[in-house]
């Protein structure tokens, strides 16, 4: 069953893989060779893969059907289909106005207890959110049409449906459902397992994204060290990004064998440490869905017990993978020029560290200062000080320190040490802020535990800056 309670974890996590437990190959993040999609900004092309290691038994397609009138070129209908029934798990937005596809996909997974899922269909250009009973029927029609193409009974009943539905785009408008339904057979006929097909499918779920977000990895598990498994995922999101998730769609596929209850637990764990640890603008959307499908085609013993070495290994793999996907979303934040990691150290608890990091990440004053390359650490400290919901004694001003950590590995630039301001080298600060990547470190010194609390808990958040372009993009969004 899909939990109805918020799944945002209160602490961060950096996976540590035991030697021999998992061998994860590097993510396929490489520079484009040829051809180069001219629509992708040159600065973003390094994040688009030129090849991939995709899971067995999955085929995908991206098709243009014209959901949004202004889109006359790019694919806007994605289909991801497995040759075999899958275990499936999903996590959804906690926004009270949950879009029709969110409601329908929840019902499908619940009715099937996460078993027997065959496909995902997703459209961009229209969110199908706040569209009443008609919107619910449209989402069900999309699911049923894919089931029909697969050759399954398509009754429209939740228990019979095997296709999850996702939508993203403008809220409050009905889908051009005739275009979508008529385009589904074409998309199904074009299903392919090639890298080009995966990339085109990732492009089909984009809205204001400037590049398709696609990753793939290969790995092994302790019980089958000679057997290679694969995981691939695509995500979209550039604005309205803040936990509990936001305008985020994510589709992850693996050929590893994982039982549905274990898969749901694995996904919830990984999302709390990845997609729920990012922020672009602090807004939470109506449509967020992250789904993972496991078809087991690569063989091996199914993962079921949380106590097993395979479960532990898969947890590390999935968490690392979703973190990489989530960070691509931040790198494509609307109008963003900076990718910022904020790390809160030596907190009495994970939850307090995460709350403080989250508060810094969504501060407009911090984000605009970073855009202006201004080492205004007072704004960071201010955000730390007004963080709501933390335990008493977490923040002791005279034990708090702030610094910038450069990407080149050089020593941290200390801005505040134990509550005392440092004489900041403005020239070095300016040089650090010229870089695209930056880490802000806030050390709480153990809070009211003092020296005894040092070496305590960390919290991590990833976010971007605010630029003039962010306002322009969102001011013109519906046009």
UniProtKB/Swiss-Prot annotation:
Keywords (alphabetical) are: Acyltransferase, Amino-acid biosynthesis, Arginine biosynthesis, Autocatalytic cleavage, Mitochondrion, Multifunctional enzyme, Transferase, Transit peptide
Cite the post-translational modification comment: The alpha and beta chains are autoproteolytically processed from a single precursor protein within the mitochondrion.
Give the active-site positions.
247
Which reaction is recorded as catalysed by this protein? N(2)-acetyl-L-ornithine + L-glutamate = N-acetyl-L-glutamate + L-ornithine; L-glutamate + acetyl-CoA = N-acetyl-L-glutamate + CoA + H(+)
The protein's location, in the record's own words, is: Mitochondrion matrix
At which residues is there a site annotated Cleavage?
246-247
The enzyme's E.C. designation: 2.3.1.35, 2.3.1.1
Q: Where is the transit peptide?
A: 1-32
Q: Which GO terms describe its cellular component?
A: mitochondrial matrix
Q: Which residues bind substrate?
A: 207, 236, 247, 334, 474, 479
Specify the pathway. Amino-acid biosynthesis; L-arginine biosynthesis; L-ornithine and N-acetyl-L-glutamate from L-glutamate and N(2)-acetyl-L-ornithine (cyclic): step 1/1; Amino-acid biosynthesis; L-arginine biosynthesis; N(2)-acetyl-L-ornithine from L-glutamate: step 1/4
State the similarity comment.
Answer: Belongs to the ArgJ family.
Assembly behavior:
Heterodimer of an alpha and a beta chain.
Q: Supply the name of the protein.
A: Arginine biosynthesis bifunctional protein ArgJ, mitochondrial
């Amino acid at each position: 069953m899909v939990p109805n309670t918020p799944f945002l974890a209160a602490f961060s996590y950096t996976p540590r893989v035991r030697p021999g437990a998992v061998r994860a190959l590097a993510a396929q993040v490489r520079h484009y060779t040829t051809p180069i999609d001219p629509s992708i900004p040159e600065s973003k092309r390094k994040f688009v893969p030129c090849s991939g290691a995709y899971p067995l038994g999955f085929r995908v397609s991206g098709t243009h059907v014209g959901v949004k009138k202004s889109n006359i070129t790019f694919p806007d209908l994605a289909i991801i289909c497995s040759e075999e029934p899958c275990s499936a798990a999903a996590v959804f937005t906690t926004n009270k106005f949950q879009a029709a596809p969110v409601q329908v996909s929840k019902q499908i997974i619940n009715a099937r207890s996460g078993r027997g899922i065959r496909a995902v269909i997703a459209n961009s250009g229209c969110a199908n959110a706040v569209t009443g009973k008609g919107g619910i029927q449209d989402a069900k029609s999309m699911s049923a049409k894919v089931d029909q193409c697969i050759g399954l009974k398509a009754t429209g009943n939740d228990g019979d449906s095997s296709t999850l539905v996702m939508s993203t785009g403008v809220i409050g408008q009905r889908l051009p459902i005739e275009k979508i339904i008529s385009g589904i057979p074409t998309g199904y006929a074009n299903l392919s397992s090639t890298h080009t097909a995966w990339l085109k499918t990732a492009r089909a779920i984009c809205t204001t994204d400037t590049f398709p977000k696609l990753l793939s990895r290969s790995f092994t598990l302790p019980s089958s060290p000679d057997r290679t498994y694969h995981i691939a995922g695509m995500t979209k999101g550039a604005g309205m990004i803040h936990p509990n998730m936001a305008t985020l769609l994510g589709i992850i596929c693996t050929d590893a064998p994982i039982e549905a209850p274990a898969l749901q637990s694995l996904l919830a764990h990984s999302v709390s440490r990845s997609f729920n640890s990012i922020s672009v603008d602090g807004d939470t959307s109506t449509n967020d869905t992250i789904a993972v499908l496991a078809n087991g085609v690569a063989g091996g013993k199914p993962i079921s017990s949380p106590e097993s070495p395979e479960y532990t290994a898969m947890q590390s793999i999935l968490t690392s993978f979703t973190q990489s996907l989530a960070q691509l979303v931040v790198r494509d934040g609307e109008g963003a020029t900076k990718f910022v990691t904020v790390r809160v150290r030596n907190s009495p608890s994970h939850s307090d560290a995460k709350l403080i990091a989250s508060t810094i990440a969504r501060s407009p004053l911090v984000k605009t200062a970073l855009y202006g390359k201004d080492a205004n650490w007072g704004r960071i400290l201010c955000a730390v000080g007004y963080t709501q919901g933390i335990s008493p004694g977490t923040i002791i001003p005279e034990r708090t320190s702030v610094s910038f950590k450069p990407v080149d590995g050089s020593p941290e630039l200390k801005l505040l040490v134990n509550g005392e301001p440092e004489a900041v080298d403005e020239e070095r600060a300016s040089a650090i802020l010229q870089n695209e990547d930056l880490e802000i470190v806030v050390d709480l010194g153990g809070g009211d535990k003092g020296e005894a609390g040092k070496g305590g808990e960390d919290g991590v958040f990833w976010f971007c800056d605010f630029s003039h372009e962010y306002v322009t993009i969102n001011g013109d969004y519906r046009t």
